[in-house]
Amino acid sequence: YVSQRLCGSQLVDTLYSVCRHRGFYRPNDGIVDQCCTNICSRNQLMSYCND
């Protein structure tokens, strides 16, 4: 995974791919700002995966 800007369905699809069976939650703290407005790293995406 290369850090990149992800928006809309591309962001959701990438979260499914990164989190796999753990799933992910819908945070209120700005995933769109982190990953759509700015460039998002794999570690940033993984922080939204369920434990």
Curated annotation (Swiss-Prot):
Provide one Gene Ontology biological process annotation.
glucose metabolic process
Q: Name one GO cellular component term.
A: extracellular region
Any Pfam family hit: Insulin
Instruction: Note the InterPro entries from the entry.
Output: Insulin (IPR004825), Insulin-like (IPR016179), Insulin-like_sf (IPR036438), Insulin_CS (IPR022353), Insulin_family (IPR022352)
Recite the UniProt keywords alphabetically: Carbohydrate metabolism, Disulfide bond, Glucose metabolism, Hormone, Secreted
Entry superkingdom: Eukaryota
Which cysteines are disulphide-bonded? 7-36, 19-49, 35-40
Q: What would you give as a GO molecular function for this chain, any one? A: hormone activity
Location of the protein in the cell? Secreted
Q: Does the keyword Phosphoprotein apply?
A: no
- Protein family according to the UniProt entry: Belongs to the insulin family.
Its biological purpose is as follows: Insulin decreases blood glucose concentration. It increases cell permeability to monosaccharides, amino acids and fatty acids. It accelerates glycolysis, the pentose phosphate cycle, and glycogen synthesis in liver.
Q: How does it assemble?
A: Heterodimer of a B chain and an A chain linked by two disulfide bonds.
Name recorded for this polypeptide? Insulin
Q: What is the lineage of its organism?
A: Eukaryota, Metazoa, Chordata, Craniata, Vertebrata
- The protein's gene is named INS
